[in-house]
Amino acid sequence: KMGINVVYMLPISKFSLKDKKGDLGSPYGVSNFNELDPNLKDYLTKDSMTLDEEFEAFVEACHILNMRVMIDIIPRTNAVENDLIKDHPDWFYWIKASEYEKYKVPTVEGIGNTTLPILEYMEKVYKSEDTFRHINMFQYNPKDQNKVLWNKIKNKKNLSEEIEKKFDLRIAPAFSDSQPPWTDVTFFRMYEDFPKETKEFLDTTDRPPYILFDTIKSNMYHGEKPNIKLWEKLADIVPSYQRRFGIDGARIDMGHALPSKLLQMIISKARENDEDFSFIAEELQVSNAQFAYDAGYNMIIGNGFTM
């Protein structure tokens, strides 16, 4: 016997192939949290079982064998082409489609590529010409630009293409450090305003929302207007899988970049249904294990990738 008693799976939700990286795309580019990836359908069952029924049976079989089932949830990012855009274009960041090829991570002279964006560096970040160029690329969402036109196109099948055609807009890709932009995913707008810790460095707050090192790290930098409807949506991902399939745990992707109040919503809502529900933190530093435990996690990924 191998002694395995937990099955942990990479994301199983439906994901998008738009602007994919590589040939296969990434399951972390989730386009619909609540739908299972249709590619997971077992061809052997044909029409005798639905995909949902297959996963439900899988979880049941694991439980019969005294094995727990854990999934991966992705509440910090979403695919650049996703099912939430139609009703919530304001939950995302936008740039001009015609300037897409110019979009890149801003660099700041004197600050290393992998430096933690602590507050003492942020004034220098905002004074950088490259940062100024970067944040000026961002635009207001299409609905706010022209609500009448938005209502005409929002139900179109190829919505992303329609937005490009009618508004010259695309969702801005996510990025991290000096890596090339993550072309297939973007960040959620966790707050409806700018971070209170750094907005003093802006020339004006009368500008579109933007992605920058501080807005990415919403665990460190907070607005005063939480995007409550979005938070409630994200906090219901795990309960949805509990209700439908009876899963036993989840790893929270980029949980380290979530507002602490949202993280607590996610953890507490899951444990209202199952007090023994387990969470894995995407924490690579063993020295932060106690912090993860205090936040409600049961375990961390650890430093196995770098050993």
Region spans (language model):
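Short catalytic-loop micro-motif centered on adjacent basic/acidic residues
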Residues: 70, 249-253
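Short acidic-aromatic active-site loops that bind/stabilize oxyanions
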Residues: 48, 220-231
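Glycan-recognition surfaces
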Residues: 199-207, 272-307
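Acidic/aromatic-lined carbohydrate-recognition and catalytic surfaces
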Residues: 1-200, 257-286
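N-terminal small/glycine-rich loop or linker at the start of catalytic domains
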Residues: 185, 189-223
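Short, acidic/polar
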Residues: 1, 226-244
